[in-house]
A protein has these predicted regions:
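Nucleotide-activated sugar donor-binding and catalytic core shared by glycosyltransferases
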Residues: 1-212
Length: 212
């Protein structure tokens, strides 16, 4: 039998030596990003550029008026989307600095509306504990200032004026919707030191990597 591999490990980001195992065990590679092709071409691995599945899976953008009606927001005021991550490791380290940034933005623009996307992978007791703990440290921010939204990420991504988010696939979705974004990431000290030593990339976030 032959082995066909779609959505390859991100060897272009770290541990390029894994390409030797790919050559040994995989008969044909289907690339999701254009720049992957040069790696497999140089390694003499048969490949086809198939494109990223997100391009065909994303729903049409949600109209701002529809989004505002759905969540009782004022379409005349700016809306900021916040994505603190879909993993506990991300949310643990990003929730507090993100809400701190929101508090500062609200000081500059009291009419700013903030929606925070809760990942369905995070259970309610854990998520709201982290959220409430982070919120309690912001003296000028209340629960009424941040609307939590679940199961509607694509609407948040497409209807907001801008988003701040953890690095991940969601950044590519925001780029496809042409939504301005700030990409951020924070984790424990030890994993950060390890990543610094094995990662080849000078930038963070799939949109930046594609542009680079």
């Amino acid at each position: 039998y032959k082995v066909y591999f779609y959505i390859m490990p991100q060897i272009w980001a770290s541990r390029l030596g894994r390409i030797k195992k790919i050559k040994r065990y995989v008969d044909h590679v289907f690339c999701t990003f254009p720049f992957e092709a040069s790696l497999y071409r140089a390694a003499e691995i048969p490949y086809t550029y198939a494109g990223h599945p997100l391009l065909s899976q994303l729903p049409p953008p949600t109209k701002r008026e529809v989004f505002c009606n759905r969540y009782k927001l004022n379409p005349e005021h700016r809306i900021l989307g916040v994505f603190p991550g879909s993993r506990k490791l991300e949310t643990d380290h990003l929730m507090e600095p993100m809400l701190e940034a929101v508090a500062k933005l609200k000081q500059d623009d009291p009419n700013l509306q903030v929606v925070l996307a809760k990942a369905s992978s995070l259970k309610d007791p854990y998520f709201y504990k982290v959220f409430n703990n982070a919120l309690s440290k912001q003296s000028n921010l209340t629960q009424g200032d941040v609307r939590i939204i679940e199961h509607d990420n694509h609407a948040v991504l497409s209807a907001c004026d801008a988003v701040v988010m953890a690095s991940g696939t969601v950044t590519l979705e925001a780029a496809i919707y042409h939504t301005p974004m700030v990409i951020t990431y924070k984790g424990p000290w030890l994993p950060y030191q390890i990543v610094r030593r094995v990662c080849y990339l000078p930038c963070l976030g799939l949109p930046n990597i594609l542009c680079h």
